[in-house]
C-alpha cells in the first residue's frame, strides 16, 4: 500500500501493477473465441481473439463496454440496429443494452469494461463458451 495526502487527509491505495500482454494466459473459450484478461478493482480490459465466423450470442451485462478493433471487423447488432466496426474503430455499448456480434474476418479487439465482469473472472459465461 502507498499512502499519500489528498484533500487534507491521508489516503491509502494499492501499488500500481504493470503487465505485458505476451505474459498473460490466453483462455480458449471455444474453437473460434479466446481471450486474455487484465482486471483491476473497478475496470478490466481484455484482448479478445475471434476467428472469422465466430458468433458472440446476444447477451447484456451491467458493465459499460468499449470495444476497440485492433485487427479485423465485427458486425454488431444492438437494439435491432446493425453496425460494422472495423480496424481502428471504437464502439461504446451502454450498460444493460442487449448486443451480439459476428466476426466478419479474423479479429483482435480490446474490450474495456467498467465495472468489471465478474462472470468472466469466475468463468460463468456459458454464452461465450458454447459460441460457434
Model-derived regions: residue spans:
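A short, N-terminal "cap"/entry segment at the start of jelly-roll beta-barrel domains
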Residues: 2-42, 46, 125-132
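Short histidine-centered beta-strand/loop micro-motifs
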Residues: 36-37, 48-49, 56-61, 102
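Short strand-coil-strand connectors
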Residues: 41, 77-81, 104
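Anionic, Ser/Thr-rich low-complexity intrinsically disordered regions
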Residues: 46, 76-78, 110, 118-122
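A cytosolic small-molecule/anion-sensing beta-strand core signal
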Residues: 70-71, 86-87, 105
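Ligand-binding loop in jelly-roll beta-barrel domains
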Residues: 95-119
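Short acidic-glycine-tyrosine-enriched beta hairpin
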Residues: 80-95
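Short, conserved beta-strand element in jelly-roll/cupin
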Residues: 49-51, 61-76
Amino acid at each position: 500500500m502507498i499512502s499519500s495526502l489528498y484533500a487534507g487527509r491521508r489516503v491509502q491505495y494499492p501499488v500500481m501493477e504493470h503487465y505485458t500482454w505476451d505474459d498473460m494466459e490466453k483462455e480458449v473459450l471455444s474453437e473460434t473465441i479466446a481471450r486474455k484478461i487484465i482486471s483491476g478493482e473497478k475496470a478490466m480490459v481484455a484482448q479478445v481473439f475471434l476467428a472469422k465466423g465466430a458468433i458472440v450470442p446476444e447477451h447484456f451485462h451491467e458493465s459499460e463496454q468499449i470495444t476497440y478493433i485492433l485487427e479485423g471487423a465485427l458486425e454488431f447488432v444492438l437494439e435491432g440496429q446493425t453496425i460494422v466496426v472495423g480496424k481502428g474503430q471504437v464502439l461504446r455499448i451502454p450498460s444493460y443494452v442487449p448486443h451480439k456480434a459476428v466476426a466478419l474476418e479474423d479479429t483482435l479487439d480490446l474490450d474495456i469494461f467498467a465495472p468489471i465482469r465478474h462472470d468472466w473472472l469466475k468463468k460463468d459465461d456459458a454464452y461465450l463458451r458454447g459460441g460457434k
